[in-house]
Amino acid sequence: MKLNPNNTWTLVEARMNEEKDPITRRNLGLVLEHMKAEAKGDIEGVVATLTEKPRYVAHDVPGNELMNPQGDKDSIRAFYDLTIIQTGAHQLELDCDRVIADHHSVMTEGVMRMAYPGRTLAAMGMEVEDLDAYYLYQSRMSVVWPVDSKEGKLIGEETYTGTDGMDGILDRKISQDDIVPLSI
């Protein structure tokens, strides 16, 4: 089982390159820039794609304030720092099989995979066999990327997850060799 973070934006980039409408092309470009910054763990690069009052919505956990940051860019910075950087779970892939785009938003859909370090899962209270290994979060996910037409920036992300990607995570052990290096 391999995790290839470079797959995340392949379809978005292809769709952007064939798009003739300049506004829709810009919107796809924002998502592409956001995805690449996220893959590099570049929080400032992610925040640069967002409006001044961003909003993230995780529809599967609407009451969880950490997973639904909004209001300012500092709340988004804190979200990425806590959920991606501090956990070490920055190696991710959205194996995207659908991209829909218009003047108001972009929608991406596919299988989300994230490599969680064994030590992170142990700190979360799980009984981990190998602390030095990675374990694969996996779930079908759709992301709606609404765009603020006045600012020409992403409002944020609205995610819809098919299943809990943590279910069975300890059965999906991978090594660093199973993670394809970034090529950006």
Report each predicted region and the residues it spans.
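A solvent-exposed, acidic/Ser-Thr-rich amphipathic alpha-helical stretch
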Residues: 43-119
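Low-complexity, intrinsically disordered terminal/linker segments enriched in charged
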Residues: 2-16, 132-139, 153-184
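Short structured motifs
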Residues: 31, 92-95, 128-129
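Residue-level recognition of short loop/turn positions
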Residues: 53, 150-151
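Short, low-complexity N-terminal intrinsically disordered segments enriched in polar/charged residues
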Residues: 1-48, 52, 184
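Short, surface-exposed alpha-helical recognition segments that flank or form part
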Residues: 22-23, 71, 132
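Hydrophobic/aromatic beta-strand elements that line small-molecule binding cavities or substrate pockets
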Residues: 94-99, 140-146, 159-160
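Exposed beta-sheet edge and beta->alpha loop/turn motif
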Residues: 106, 110-150
